[in-house]
Amino acid sequence: MELVEITREEVINNCEKYYENRQQFFIKTKHKEGLESAYLYQWEKYDDNFEEIKVVYCFYYDSGNSAPFDDEDIEHIYIIQ
């Protein structure tokens, strides 16, 4: 087993699969040394017109923080393969 770097696009394109499988991620952020373990968190929000609810996924870190995929603090995303 080894850590493999994946892109944000891969996460976005496969977020439902990763969420359902409880895929563990390891995230490297700008402001923290080492990797932080994370999973996908799912929540619902209304669109801009408050007419339709969208499902949104973001990273939820074991430390209790959360971040969207496009967070500028995220430098690298890894999974175990």
Residue ranges and their predicted role:
Residues 2-17:
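Mixed-charge, Lys/Arg-rich low-complexity intrinsically disordered regions
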Residues 22-78:
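Acidic, low-complexity, intrinsically disordered interaction modules
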